[in-house]
């Protein structure tokens, strides 16, 4: 069965990740740097943006030019936090789903972001393939990934304090379901899916605990913003941002009814039948729940 073949998923259900990692975890510097990078790479606006691995909506307000945003995350807990932060409106659609088995019709979105999410993907090429299917030709894709070939890992490897090589192309799993990737491998996977890389930014140049303790985060982020453009020459920071465009042209129309956004993630059938608080597949008869404003495609309703 399809469920048995899917790669494992990093599930933040019930986690205090947003408060522990971001709000009280000493990462204001990283958050500011990522905000600067997103502002530089985002298109001026659009109709429908897919935020993959949206979590608690930390970055969602950084996409003001888009008329509607779909927040996708595997964790319903994280989406509830995003809903509390952003509210319920026609601007935001909350979807609990597996990136490897997305519930969207092909060619729906004119933009997508994947920030601090690919590093949880056991099968990154499969995840990028799903992104490509969801996008319209000519759509913008902003991808952040954890860089295997960063200065710290290169130094540790040279000193014999690290077994894995930062120079080989295969991903390294430094802890369960946490992966670093080689820049050349990422570029090749994007090319194979028909993406054209337009800009590369290096981010978090000063991710050093001592510096973050003694230098104000705003000042550090300002320095980082000056250096981000060096990504066009080489990528040696722990975090890399890419702006890519899917080959082709065309701006497809976006359905007014969000029910038309979805296909059955099990068999691919669309449209789904709206049953109020559930969506039903007319082909395989699976039922997907809608509860508290969150569409849940993680598993069939019992």
Predicted regions located by residue number:
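A conserved beta-strand element that flanks and buttresses the S-adenosyl-L-methionine
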Residues: 113
